Curated annotation (Swiss-Prot):
Major place of residence: cytoplasm
Pathway noted in the entry: Carbohydrate biosynthesis; gluconeogenesis; Carbohydrate degradation; glycolysis; D-glyceraldehyde 3-phosphate and glycerone phosphate from D-glucose: step 2/4
Protein name stated in the entry: Glucose-6-phosphate isomerase
Keyword Isomerase: yes
Gene that this polypeptide is encoded by: pgi
Residues of the active site: 351, 382, 510
Length: 545
């Protein structure tokens, strides 16, 4: 456990020594700070100089990582050891993008051979859709792709297809359905033509309630309009491992793309779950996405901790969570194409590390994953940045931006990028009472009024942030960015001694929903309901009589 590691008390003592130091003072005294706390990898760079740390902090954090045998645990993951201990599974999403020829054997299965076999089928299928060779039941080309999934079967593909829209096929329109409320699927069905639409049903077990409900609604809609169930074979494909259920649905087994238990949902966009990505972007760009992630994998596996991006980001996060007692972390992308990135990272981070039980089954006496949230940075400035600047919470921030200007939008990117740098500087430097007072007096305010108002215009600063810069929003850079955050999450899970690869927290609510659904549908359940739940069930039933 973290609190039992030999470096932990050293970090506690060090925290007491520097907790009141203002970052602005460090910058004033150290002209090399920005260049020393800057790491470049391929087309992605990290400026972590605006953090409340110094060389001693980093030295101790690296010692903490050594206390946890981080290097050995990284290797264990890549080699296919069953580090998902509660489910007795290997964790090999890295194998999905590996360009290495060294085979990984897992329970007598050749992992890379299996992965590449599925990728080959995905490439052939996506080529047939993109080229127009795969036709619908009236011999029309496919114009719309509807991905039906939820969680990891939705968020990754949605995020990547949105981020890389400039690389998408101009004929294809992408639609993503996850919510079971009925509104989302019906809204999509209103926009599309059954004769030119391909549905991708993404569910490992092909029994996920939300996904199957939406898929059956789409199936009913399609059959009513096409007039024959046999046409399903041309318009529905599945990403699943349940061949029998897929065939019962009406999907040809040749249109089923498999993935494996060693790939968790939130790590699965690199697998057949990414079929919608490959169809939209094409195999060349999908390969570039995989390559970007692979290069980050190799960096994570081989780079010394001092220049290792995932290790640095993971350890800096631990520094704030377990020593500064930060409860929250903000993801602020400054690019409209990255608008779904924060909610993708929400699942990746909080479903992985939102745990309080150690690998040994003990209750953990310290904080683990913070609340991860975010929005488009430029919009957020006009919404919740007020709290970040002048509120009472310490919330570290990841600013994410690209250097590449958008064509045909002169001046836009300069405005955007200036705001990234200005916000990071403002969070670091702040504004003192004396500075605020001087500004007000310079504007001609009455002295007494200026003294009162100046208190409200103080920015305390010393608010930490990372700046992640991509040269451009490209397939390889998005691949590297996602892999960076995957490995950051892994690092923190190792430090906290938790299993980052199960998600038992999603199960209880699903179990309790079963008898409640029976009641809502008019069937009696023998389950116990608390008085509040019972009252609300009756309220619903009475309204819908």
């Amino acid at each position: 456990m973290l609190t039992q590691l030999k470096t932990y008390p050293k970090l506690l003592k060090h925290y007491e020594e520097i907790k009141e130091v203002h970052m602005h003072d460090w910058f004033s005294k150290d002209k090399e700070r920005a260049s020393r706390y800057f790491v470049q990898f391929e087309s992605l760079s990290l400026d972590y100089s605006k953090n409340r740390l110094n060389d001693t902090t980093l030295k101790l954090l690296f010692e903490l990582a050594d206390d946890c045998s981080l290097k050995e645990k990284i290797e264990a993951m890549f080699k296919g050891e069953k580090i998902n201990t509660t489910e007795k599974r290997a964790v090999l999403h890295t194998a999905l993008r590996s360009l290495n020829d060294a085979e990984i054997l897992l329970d007598n299965m050749e992992v890379l051979k299996s992965v590449r076999s599925v990728l080959k089928r995905m490439r052939a299928f996506s080529d047939s859709v993109r080229s127009g060779k795969r036709l619908g039941y009236t011999n029309q080309v496919i114009t719309d792709i509807v991905n039906i999934g939820i969680g990891g079967s939705d968020l990754g593909a949605l995020m990547v297809c949105t981020a890389l829209k400039r690389y998408g096929h101009p004929r294809l329109k992408m639609h993503f359905v996850s919510n079971v409320d009925g509104t989302q699927i019906l809204d999509v069905l209103e926009k599309i033509n059954p004769a030119s639409t391909l549905f991708i049903v993404a569910s490992k077990t092909f029994s996920t309630q939300e996904t199957l409900t939406n898929a059956l609604t789409a199936r009913k809609w399609f059959v009513e309009r096409s007039g024959d169930e046999k046409h399903i074979a041309k318009h529905f494909v599945a990403v699943s491992t349940n061949k029998e259920a897929v065939q019962q649905f009406g999907i040809d087994e040749h249109n089923m793309f498999e993935f494996w238990d060693f790939v968790g949902g939130r790590y699965s966009l690199w697998s057949a779950i990414g079929l919608s990505i490959m169809i939209y972007l094409g195999k060349k760009n999908f390969n570039a996405l995989l390559k970007g992630a692979y290069l980050m994998d190799e960096h994570f596996r081989n780079a010394p901790f001092e220049s290792n991006l995932p290790v640095l980001m993971g350890l800096i996060g631990v520094w704030y969570i377990n020593f500064f007692q930060s409860k929250s972390h903000l993801i602020a992308p400054y690019d409209q194409y990255l608008r779904h990135f924060p909610k993708f990272i929400q699942q990746l981070d909080m479903e992985s590390n939102g745990k309080r039980i150690s690998k040994k089954g003990e209750t953990i006496p310290y904080d683990t994953c913070p609340v991860v949230w975010g929005d488009m940075g430029i919009n957020a400035q006009h919404a919740f940045f007020q709290l970040l600047h002048q509120g009472t919470h310490l919330i570290p921030i990841d600013f994410i931006a690209s250097l590449d200007k958008k064509p045909n939008a002169k001046g836009h990117h300069e405005i955007l990028f200036s705001n990234v740098l200005a916000q990071a500087q403002a969070f670091m430097k702040g504004k003192s009472y004396e500075e605020a007072l001087g500004e007000l007096l310079f504007k001609g305010l009455d002295k007494d009024e200026a003294k009162d108002l100046a208190h409200h215009r103080v920015f305390f600063g010393n608010r930490p942030s990372n700046i992640l810069l991509l040269e451009k929003i490209s397939p390889s850079n998005i691949g590297a960015l996602v892999a960076l955050y995957e490995h950051k999450v892994f690092v923190q899970g190792v430090i906290w001694d938790i299993n980052s690869f199960d998600q038992w927290g999603v199960e209880l609510g699903k179990e309790l929903a079963v008898p409640i659904l029976q009641e809502l549908e008019g069937h009696k359940s023998n389950a116990y309901f608390d008085s509040s739940t019972k009252h609300l069930i009756e309220l619903y039933k009475n309204y819908n009589q």
